[in-house]
């Protein structure tokens, strides 16, 4: 068993408390976290939260897959980039950051879902932000990446065909590339099924 949390500004305190309580009940179960609230200053976060075993830094798609494989095979964590973890003796190891995947290589995680009747789907056609707002974590890395429009169209059509009631775009700066945003909106307009609402 392993317990894994995604940490954001709105849930980080709950995750800290829950991890500490869970660790009291099941100290043998590793607890891992990831997300924007824990990807920076990982050594400090681990020292302040002794119940947490490790942190996935940055984007988690490839890291989580490798981490789960490591747990299944009971292999060393030392070959996994993008993690920070506590060894059995308490020392903290910080592995090198993982390079960002091209957007088209990120998995489409909805293909195997069947029942969409009461679901809200969160979808990203891009990641990153070109701006430098001092209060926002997005300003740390100004890389802006896009899924190719043909791939986005195929994925949107999947939602339309499945009659998903609500699809929410979670792109940080959806309209910063005009042709990308307009391509998506035109596709949605031309393929409207009268059921799927895109937000």
Q: What residue spans do the PLM features occupy?
A:
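Flexible, glycine-rich phosphate/dinucleotide-binding loops
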Residues: 40, 92, 101, 142, ...
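A short, sequence-level motif marking secondary-structure junctions
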Residues: 97-103
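Short, surface-exposed acidic/glycine-rich loop or hinge patches that mediate macromolecular interfaces
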Residues: 8-9, 36, 100, 128, ...
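Radical SAM [4Fe-4S] cluster-binding motif and immediate context
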Residues: 104-199
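Glycine-rich beta-alpha loop elements in corrinoid/cobalamin-binding modules
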Residues: 2-97
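Surface-exposed loop/turn and secondary-structure junction residues enriched for glycine/proline
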Residues: 41-43, 48, 80, 86, ...
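A generic structural signal for short, non-catalytic loop/turn and secondary-structure boundary residues
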Residues: 76-78, 99, 116, 193
């Amino acid at each position: 068993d392993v317990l894994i949390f995604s940490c954001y500004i709105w849930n980080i305190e709950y995750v800290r408390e829950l991890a500490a309580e869970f660790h009291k009940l099941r100290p043998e179960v590793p607890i891992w976290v990831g997300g924007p609230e824990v990807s920076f200053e990982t050594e400090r976060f681990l020292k302040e939260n002794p119940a947490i075993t490790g942190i996935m830094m940055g984007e988690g798609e490839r890291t989580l897959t490798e981490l789960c494989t490591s747990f299944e095979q009971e292999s060393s964590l030392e070959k996994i980039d993008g993690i920070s973890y506590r060894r059995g003796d308490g020392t903290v190891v910080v592995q090198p950051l993982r390079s960002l995947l091209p957007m088209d290589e990120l998995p489409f995680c909805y293909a195997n879902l069947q029942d969409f009747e009461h679901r809200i789907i969160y979808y990203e056609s891009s990641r990153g932000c070109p701006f430098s707002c001092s209060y926002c974590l997005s300003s740390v890395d100004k890389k802006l990446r896009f899924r190719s429009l043909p791939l986005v169209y195929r994925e949107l059509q999947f939602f339309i065909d499945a009659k998903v009631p609500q699809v929410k775009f979670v792109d940080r700066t959806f309209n910063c590339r005009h042709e990308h945003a307009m391509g998506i909106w035109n596709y949605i307009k031309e393929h409207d099924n009268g059921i799927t609402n895109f937000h």
